[in-house]
């Protein structure tokens, strides 16, 4: 059922067109500077960042370093006073809000309850696409029947058993999945998330991670801000460290966490003397099994 949404995204991956250098990236920030007041210190300082199409990219770093401000620049809530931002090669300044938020950019808020409007999960989902009637609208310009679109998103985000519940009665993880479902109904090519695992348990983190990886595999580009290093190491393709308004290092996630003394995982801290490249529990188990197999073969 989730194919209704994912097949459209998968088609983007299969296009074999020649693209300009700008168009190779879903997100490209060039030399961006931003401050909240004219004479106040810069929060974003000469920031350059490139994220490929279909990539799941995580940003980690301390509070107040400029991570959330960067998301606000990407979502056009604020604008840099110097530098440029491009989405799939197009200057962000040229986007109209309607174009940007209907089919291009999706923003998952830190507080999912801020976007709940109706008394049941199902009605809340339909509210995103202009209600149940199958008629063309600005909220729902595609030809697929709304029921099929809802069905696909519900399957993808695993909401089947929750459709008659009030959104406020859901657990933290369930609310996060509902918020994600609402954002995905707008068919974004790029998904921005601020601390999506905050306040949810490991079971729901795993479910969320699997959903995000599936979206990434089908061409959706994901930029996530997080303090959850375990989640980043497990699911993100690349991780960058934000410090004093800029990304100071950016590497493939396993390499990032394996070579980091401060931003690393519990598994890496415990096992790095024996398995320095292991950053998740699964990595450690795999390394132990491999060592045992090699010992037996000898």
Language model features by range: what are they?
Residues 60-62:
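The feature captures the beta-strand-to-loop junction immediately N-terminal to the Walker
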Residues 1-25, 263-298:
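ABC ATPase nucleotide-binding domains
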Residues 141-162:
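Conserved ABC ATPase "signature" region
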Residues 83-91, 101:
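Conserved ABC transporter NBD signature motif
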Residues 75:
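Helix-to-loop junction immediately C-terminal to a conserved catalytic motif
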């Amino acid at each position: 059922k989730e194919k209704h949404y994912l097949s459209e995204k998968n088609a983007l991956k299969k296009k074999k067109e020649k693209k300009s250098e700008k168009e190779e990236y879903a997100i490209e920030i060039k030399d961006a500077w931003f401050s909240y007041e004219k004479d106040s210190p810069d929060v974003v300082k000469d920031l350059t960042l490139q994220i490929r199409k279909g990539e799941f990219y995580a940003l980690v770093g301390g509070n107040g370093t400029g991570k959330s401000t960067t998301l606000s620049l990407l979502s056009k809530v604020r604008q840099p006073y110097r530098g440029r931002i491009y989405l799939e090669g197009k200057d962000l300044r040229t986007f109209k809000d309607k174009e940007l938020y209907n089919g291009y950019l999706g923003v998952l808020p830190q507080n999912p309850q801020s976007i709940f409007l109706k008394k049941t999960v199902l009605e809340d989902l339909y509210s995103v696409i202009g209600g149940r009637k199958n008629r063309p609208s600005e909220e729902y310009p595609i030809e697929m029947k709304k029921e099929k679109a809802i069905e696909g998103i519900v399957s993808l985000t695993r909401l089947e058993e929750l459709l008659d519940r009030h959104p406020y009665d859901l657990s933290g993880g369930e609310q996060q999945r509902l918020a994600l479902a609402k954002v995905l109904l707008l068919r974004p090519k790029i998904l921005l998330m601020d601390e999506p695992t905050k306040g949810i348990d490991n079971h729901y983190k795993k479910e969320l991670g699997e959903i995000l990886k599936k979206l990434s595999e089908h061409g959706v580009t994901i930029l996530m801000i997080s303090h959850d290093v375990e989640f980043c190491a497990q699911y993100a393709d690349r991780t960058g460290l934000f410090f004093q308004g800029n990304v100071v290092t950016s590497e493939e996630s396993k390499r990032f966490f394996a070579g980091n003394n401060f931003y690393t995982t519990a598994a890496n801290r415990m096992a790095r003397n024996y398995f320095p490249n292991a950053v998740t529990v699964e990595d450690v188990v795999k390394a132990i099994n491999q060592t045992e197999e090699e010992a037996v073969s000898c």
